[in-house]
Amino acid sequence: MAKYDKADIERRMAGAVESLKSDLSGLRTGRANTSLLDPVVVEVYGAMMPLNQVATVNAPEPRMLAVQVWDKANVSAVEKGITKANLGLNPMTDGQTVRLPMPDLTEERRKELAKLAGQYAEKAKIAIRNVRRDGMEDLKADEKAKDISEDDRKRMEDEVQKLTDKYVAEADSAAEAKEKEIMTQ
């Protein structure tokens, strides 16, 4: 029974890139982005709940987020949750709406965020290389078990390497785009 599964390897590599893109979307640039509030949890009804389950988040202006709280009793809890999340945002309450103006990023903070984007990319590339290693080990095991020939193994190793190169390049381009976005705001 062959262990090597090209589709699984490609799926796992694509998953690493998607995870990177998700992580990068949470980095704050100068523009308002609703995904910035994804990690915020709010204590309501005696339980911790994600912000998106107690309110609607939108970006009415390029530098402002608005959180429309569904239950008026939860407004202060939402405000507290946003403050606790340490996002560097200063919530202002206006009835059932919590407004979050996006402060300007300092040059130092921009560099920190760009560096963080690079770290996220490196983690994704490590994950991709780990998937490649697993694929190569599976191919060697298949060859040892006489499921494939040496020529097949080498051909398939080239395929795995090409997939690796493709997804590493994708990770790099996603990180570069985010770094550029951060530095040019």
UniProtKB/Swiss-Prot annotation:
Keywords: Cytoplasm, Protein biosynthesis. The keyword Cytoplasm applies. It is found in: Cytoplasm. The keyword Transferase does not apply. GO terms for molecular function: ribosomal large subunit binding. Responsible for the release of ribosomes from messenger RNA at the termination of protein biosynthesis. May increase the efficiency of translation by recycling ribosomes from one round of translation to another. This is Ribosome-recycling factor.
